[in-house]
Amino acid sequence: MTQMPQTNARVHAGRMAYHAGLSAEASVIREYESHGYVFEAQRWRGQVGEIDLVLRKSGLVVFVEVKKSKSFERAALRISPTQKRRIFATGEEFVAQEPQGLLTDMRFDVALVDAAGAVQILENALSEG
């Protein structure tokens, strides 16, 4: 049985989004590394969800949610309250494996990537409030 054209288009769009996401994440990793951070994990998956990037610097664990869109503003709007809760829970799951557990120094950032590939990092951008 052959796929319907609409299904093929959806599969193609999904593949394009996947590769665009990988490219955006690679740009963000380079940006952090240029500021002395050490890359640890990409698309780290826990039981609750996934964290796009995990980096370290001087004992600090940084969890990064990467959002790509036509503009920084549009990218920033793509983070829902449900997604924030999932990111926090997944980050807590990650640090539970650390020697200091939940006492580990950690930060939750958002990295925005626009259509031109420019990167804007918003440190500590996710708040539980």
Swiss-Prot record:
It comes from the Bacteria. One of its GO terms (molecular function) is nucleic acid binding. Pfam families: UPF0102. SUPFAM superfamilies: Restriction endonuclease-like. Disulfide bonds: none annotated. Gene3D superfamilies: 3.40.1350.10. Belongs to the UPF0102 family. This is UPF0102 protein RD1_1191. It comes from Roseobacter denitrificans (strain ATCC 33942 / OCh 114) (Erythrobacter sp. (strain OCh 114)).
